Amino acid sequence: MNILITSPFTHISKNIHSHRAAQAAIYADQLSNVGHNVHLDISGDIAPDPNTFDEVYVYHGNDWAGSLNLFGGMKNYGGIDNLIRYSKIKSKVYSLWIDHPKYSEMLKSRMNGDIHDDWNKVDWNNLNLIENQSTIIREIEDTDKIVVGDSHAISMYRPGWFVNSVPFKTLHGALKEKLSSFIEPNHRIAEFYFGNIDVRHHLLRMKNPEKSTRNLVNAYYNQLLELDLDEVSVYELLPIENECRQIPKSGHYKNKPFHGSWNERNNIRLIFKNEMEKLCANSKIKFISWVDYLINDKGELSFYHMEKPRSVHLSRNSYPHWQGRKWSGLSETSATLDKFFK
């Protein structure tokens, strides 16, 4: 079956260093793995007519928050041609991860102001049909393997694994909801990757940060131990990048890109690592230590391995298991750490 993955507004970047594009590449890889012929719309390689495909999968980004922010407004927004094209789709549409947002309702209320004439080329009635008749899809491959974590968790994807990535979810918040709530009965092998946000923003706000970190790790471990699964693993957290790194406002908490100095946060990170490693030493829980290749000669998370030009995430080019280079139009390499993990 011929499949198109597209985005209604901003084009999916072909840049392998883009975190937003990484999730789209993962979806493309999963659909390819189950036997489909997949075209991923990326900047510079946009399919002219979506209706030549059997099915269309729509990617809304990996941080959809429920509202549209159009750069340039209704007068100068640069992605209108993409929406015009999208609004004319007649093929079966699947909405990736979330219910299809009601874009037509969000935009129609803005049509009375000072707008560009091209907005009148949008097929509003058909766009409304797409929104109402699309089918949500979350798990593309039928698999018993899952990675669970915050937005960093997508970096642990590889074929045969489902990733339940929950943006902005702290370890503290995940434990309150229970780790078991993030997995389904068909999942028998699970990896967990929470805690980076807690180190960046929260643990150094505690009265006794070191004690709070150990308590959090022990609570994490205890819930991992309670899971009725065949295999459970937990990932080491990311190193700390240099404080000069520019972080988008979406990564701020209380108007700050982080709380605590580099040394303080690195100390908390190492306490987190050492405590979890100690707990897992004689346990059925596997601790995955993996970050050494990301660290520069100053002991920092190297900017080379991070999303370009800014943000807190890894570049897909530096993911440990899989990089999906072909989805950015690049040749594949064997630069993974799979042998290291075995």
Over which residues does each language-model region extend?
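Well-ordered, non-membrane alpha-helical segments in soluble/globular domains
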Residues: 21-27, 68-85, 115-122, 130, ...
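Short acidic, S/G/P-rich loop/turn micro-motifs used as interaction or catalytic elements
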Residues: 10-13, 61-70, 101-102, 152-155, ...
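Histidine-centered active-site loop/cap adjacent to the catalytic His
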Residues: 121-137, 268-269, 277-278, 286, ...
